[in-house]
A protein has these predicted regions:
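Surface loop/turn signatures of beta-propeller and other carbohydrate-active proteins
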Residues: 1-35, 54-57, 71-98
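Short glycine/acidic-enriched loop and turn motifs that connect beta-strands
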Residues: 52-55, 110-111
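Conserved small/polar residues in nucleotide/adenosyl-binding loops
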Residues: 112-117
Length: 122
């Protein structure tokens, strides 16, 4: 799922001439809530909900951009894509923290079930 999103962006990215100068924008698709705004290894990281395949809402992925000056942002590969049964609707709001020297992402997922005994709800 991650590679599919990254490949789509490589083929359908928005040209830099069409983007604002000082605002974070996705390389392709639709952008929503900022998440995981953090400093890691001396750089500022911004993760955000987005759907890379259309300019409308879809199963949320997490985009990722990095800056050193809060003006020039570098797009990184898609950080998260909904690729599990429990997050197939999307990877929603969350945070980024440093733990044991690693950048750890925490997010919200949503699972609907009619089976109250479903193990994935425990």
């Amino acid at each position: 799922m991650l590679e599919k999103a990254n490949e789509y962006i490589r083929q359908n990215y928005i040209d830099e001439k069409e983007k604002p100068l000082f605002h974070v924008t996705p390389e392709a698709g639709w952008m929503n809530d900022p998440n995981g705004f953090s400093v890691y290894q001396g750089k500022v990281h911004l993760f955000y909900q987005f759907y890379p395949y259309k300019t409308e809402w879809g199963p949320m992925h997490w985009g990722h951009q990095v800056t050193e000056d809060l003006l020039k942002w570098e797009a990184y590969p898609v950080a998260m894509a909904p690729d599990q049964d429990y997050d197939h609707i999307g990877c929603f709001s969350g945070s980024a923290v440093e733990a044991d020297g690693k950048h750890v992402l925490l997010y919200t997922c949503l699972l609907y079930t009619s089976d109250a005994a479903d193990d994935s709800l425990r």
